[in-house]
Amino acid sequence: TSATNIFIAGGGKLADSIRQFDQLHAIGEEPSHWLCVRALSVTARILIDVLPEAALVDSLEEVRALIATRPSRICVFDPMPMLTGEQSQRGSTSLPRSWAVTSDSIAAHLAELLGATELALLKSNLPEAPSIQQASEEHFVDPYFPTAAAKLPLVRCVNLRSEAFEEVALKI
């Protein structure tokens, strides 16, 4: 069957720079969180340049429309509108606004809201241990990820730096 692949680009060096800035200037977790969310908008646009066949979307409605009309389409999701209140006003559970949440938890949250059958985390390595909790403890995923991913049927990690694209399913 066809599947819609929805990418959320991580914050990468932009988020790392914001974290360093916060450590130096103590701007606080919530303001830093929102700066990192803005960075995700930037990295989403960078990813669109790398994947020109992908559609840039920024709402659940756009994703659902894409799934309904073009189920095999690739899209890049800019989570900023969802996280700044667009979706939480409709009753969805919001994520903590802190360093405990990264693009991993945001992707898990989106997957849950969409009723996805699986979440694939594309990483540069694989976790040492195959459980979500242990992956969080070893900083492979963020501290909130075990909560964000708790209701997902399947979470896979794929090593993009492996020639064979090795993968492992994380146990909940």
Residue ranges and their predicted role:
Residues L170-I172:
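Short, surface-exposed amphipathic charged segments that create phosphate/polyanion-binding patches used
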Residues T1-V168:
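Nucleotide/pyrophosphate-binding catalytic subdomain
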